[in-house]
């Protein structure tokens, strides 16, 4: 404790000794020298302080009334007295909404339901219930040719292939020329029936598989932010 007290006393004495020359100079100096030192110091940032003790005639007209007060104040103090503009408080959930409208189209408020439906009057709307029937009819039309061709080829092969006797089946008796030609035509008809069957399966698969949209989509119209300016200003 004694060491701390001695250290504190020495610090206080050092501060007093350092401040004594300043007090002595201030006591011996005149008023003019004191004011000049204060003006030259950096305390007022190069601005002259207000001398309330000395009367001045600045700002006094011939009638003896003060026209305006001539006081030099610090810039920081002047700014502190000015009214501050507080920023507008906005809720965090509120976001700025930007409305877009197509070029050449009126605003959303002016567009009515009649205008919307007028654009689609030329289109033929098919109910959902008839879509299945139409799809089934299309499938039947696609499978008509393969079905007829396969049936005709099968019956032709059945008629063209000759009936062999027991000796011909065992190989004891050779086939005649007509039987050989009929056998060849019969196998050709069977091949045609198989081809028609493959055609029908292919058309069925293509009918139920997802189709690729090969038609080109129309170019999207450029969206322009809705504002009070004209369309030409928006293009620029």
Swiss-Prot record:
Its main location: secreted. The keyword Cytoplasm applies. Residues 70-80 have a biased composition (Polar residues). Residues 147-236 are annotated as: Required for dimerization, interactions with liposomes and liposome tubulation. GO terms for biological process: symbiont-mediated generation of symbiont replication vacuole. Residues 223-236 have a biased composition (Acidic residues). Glycans are attached at residue 213. InterPro entries: Dense_granule_Gra7_protein (IPR008120). Homodimer. Can form higher order homooligomers in a lipid-stimulated manner. Component of a complex at least composed of ROP18, GRA7 and ROP2. Interacts with ROP5. Interacts with ROP18 in the absence of ROP5. Interacts with mouse IRGA6/IIGP1 in GTP-dependent manner; the interaction results in faster turnover of the GTP-activated IRGA6/IIGP1 oligomer. Interacts with mouse TRAF6 (via N-terminal RING domain); the interaction plays a role in GRA7-induced pro-inflammatory cytokine production in mouse macrophages. This is Dense granule protein 7.
């Amino acid at each position: 404790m004694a060491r701390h007290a001695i250290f504190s006393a020495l610090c206080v004495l050092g501060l007093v000794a350092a401040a004594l020359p300043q007090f002595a100079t201030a006591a011996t100096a005149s008023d003019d020298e004191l004011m000049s030192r204060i003006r030259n110091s950096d305390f007022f940032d190069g601005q002259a302080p207000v001398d309330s003790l000395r009367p001045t005639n600045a700002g006094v007209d011939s009638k003896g009334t003060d026209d305006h007060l001539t006081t030099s104040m610090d810039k920081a103090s002047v700014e502190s007295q000015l009214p501050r503009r507080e920023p507008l408080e906005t809720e965090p959930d509120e976001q700025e909404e930007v409305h877009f409208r197509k070029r050449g189209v009126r605003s959303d408020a002016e567009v009515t339901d009649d205008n919307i439906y007028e654009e689609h009057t030329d289109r033929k709307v098919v109910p959902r219930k008839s879509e299945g029937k139409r799809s089934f009819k299309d499938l039947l039309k696609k499978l008509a040719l393969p079905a007829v061709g396969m049936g005709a080829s099968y019956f032709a092969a059945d008629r063209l292939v000759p009936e062999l006797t027991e000796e011909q089946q065992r190989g004891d008796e050779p086939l005649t020329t007509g039987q050989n030609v009929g056998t060849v035509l019969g196998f050709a008809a069977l091949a045609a029936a198989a081809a028609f069957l493959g055609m029908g399966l292919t058309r069925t698969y293509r009918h139920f598989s997802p189709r690729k949209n090969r038609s080109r989509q129309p170019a999207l119209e450029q969206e322009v932010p809705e504002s009070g300016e004209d369309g030409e200003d928006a293009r620029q």
